[in-house]
From Swiss-Prot:
This is Cobalamin biosynthesis protein CobD. PANTHER family: COBALAMIN BIOSYNTHESIS PROTEIN CBIB (PTHR34308:SF1). The chain crosses the membrane at residues 5-25, 59-79, 82-102, 158-178, 210-230, 303-323. Belongs to the CobD/CbiB family. Its main location: membrane. NCBIfam families: cobal_cbiB. It comes from Sinorhizobium sp.
Amino acid sequence: MSETILLILALALVIDRVVGDPDWLWARVPHPVVFFGKAIGFFDARLNREDLEDSARKFRGVVAILLLLGISAWFGHLLHRLFAVLGPLGFLLEAVLVAVFLAQKSLADHVRRVAGGLRQGGLEGGRAAVSMIVGRDPKTLDEPAVCRAAIESLAENFSDGVVAPAFWYAVAGLPGLLAYKMLNTADSMIGHKSPKYLHFGWASARLDDLANLPAARLSILLISAGALIHRGASAAKDALTVALRDHGLHRSPNSGWPEAAMAGALDLQLAGPRIYGGVKVSEPMINGPGRAVATSEDIDAGIAVFYGACTVMAGFVLAIAMI
């Protein structure tokens, strides 16, 4: 965790906050995650054969993800060495690359569209917007459920789309960042429990849980800080209290932390029963004593807390770099 790495990260956080993921750019050139997906698909097509025993598919999945992580870390090392010889230009280029793998503005923009969709197009407008950021069946969602889904996505993706990549870059530079993004992409592609990926994707899912563990815990402190800025000391305290009390109510070992913190910050019930692909997932409500009916104004409040948390993180990174 060198001074240079932290300064690059601070600049990257500013770039991502201001620029985000411009559609005009990624409409012309492929996003780096596209290449991660192609690499994962290559190994999936060649190693994940249906005629193999479950144990063989699990072993091949372990080999595949270890190779993918090694390749991505090696490529990150090469890029860092290249940027290092370019002086100030390399410093800027590395910051831009790091910003590409952060999701502050793009996440807030997507979630804000849900509130806008509800206000401009009613329930159908909200359902259409939220379907772009969550996997649950939008037709089963009423307006409060649409709002809850948007806020849950905001909280969860703050952890694995902002805090986690920033954490792994701070700890291990470009090799750590690229390896994390490869792992995160693999988890989304092959880490689910469908018959095809239950065994082949086992290692990717477990490693992703492990890699996101530090960020999930850090995220509750940042969300609490964001709540302090925008909603006061009581909301900040509730964010921590609910996170520590209710994180285990979520089926994910990591997502429950930021979601519970956001639920406490907004005095709102989150999670609970929902439907994915026609299958009902029965879970208790996080922050049961909180308000039961979420509104588009709660989405706005969640975004304010989110941006407050991002600001605190950027300030903390810069402060550590300057010590």
